[in-house]
């Protein structure tokens, strides 16, 4: 199944080099970033899960960029709130 997934995923992304980058980025998110897979895991490795997500059109580079920006903004907002709370506590 992985071979078919790779061919279909290449068609979704455009070329195999970008596919490698997007799939690796997504697999890393699933493995270490605490991101939940968007497809059933079915005992697959993280890279295969990432390829299946790409094949189904659930993940691409733009989607990953938007999600990363949203997370960064949320993290920055939380940091600002923490600094504000500390500053108000010193008054």
From Swiss-Prot:
SMART domains, sorted: RNA_pol_Rpb6
One Pfam family hit: RNA_pol_Rpb6
EC identifiers of the protein: 2.7.7.6
Keywords in alphabetical order: DNA-directed RNA polymerase, Nucleotidyltransferase, Transcription, Transferase
Any one Gene Ontology BP term: DNA-templated transcription
UniProt GO molecular function: DNA binding; DNA-directed RNA polymerase activity
Top-level taxonomic group: Bacteria
Catalytic activities: RNA(n) + a ribonucleoside 5'-triphosphate = RNA(n+1) + diphosphate
Record's GO cellular component terms: DNA-directed RNA polymerase complex
Complex formation: The RNAP catalytic core consists of 2 alpha, 1 beta, 1 beta' and 1 omega subunit. When a sigma factor is associated with the core the holoenzyme is formed, which can initiate transcription.
Family per record: Belongs to the RNA polymerase subunit omega family.
Matching PANTHER family: DNA-DIRECTED RNA POLYMERASE SUBUNIT OMEGA
Function: Promotes RNA polymerase assembly. Latches the N- and C-terminal regions of the beta' subunit thereby facilitating its interaction with the beta and alpha subunits.
Database matches in HAMAP family: RNApol_bact_RpoZ (MF_00366)
Protein name per the record: DNA-directed RNA polymerase subunit omega
Lineage: Bacteria, Pseudomonadati, Pseudomonadota, Gammaproteobacteria, Enterobacterales
Gene name of the encoded protein: rpoZ
């Amino acid at each position: 199944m992985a071979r078919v997934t790779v061919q279909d995923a290449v068609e979704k992304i455009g070329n195999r080099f970008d596919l490698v980058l997007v799939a690796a980025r997504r697999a890393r998110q699933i493995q270490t970033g605490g991101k939940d897979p968007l497809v059933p895991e079915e005992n697959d490795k993280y890279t295969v899960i990432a390829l299946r997500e790409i094949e189904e059109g659930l993940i691409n580079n733009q989607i990953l960029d938007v999600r990363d920006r949203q997370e960064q903004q949320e993290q920055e907002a939380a940091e600002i709130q923490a600094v504000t709370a500390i500053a108000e506590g010193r008054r």
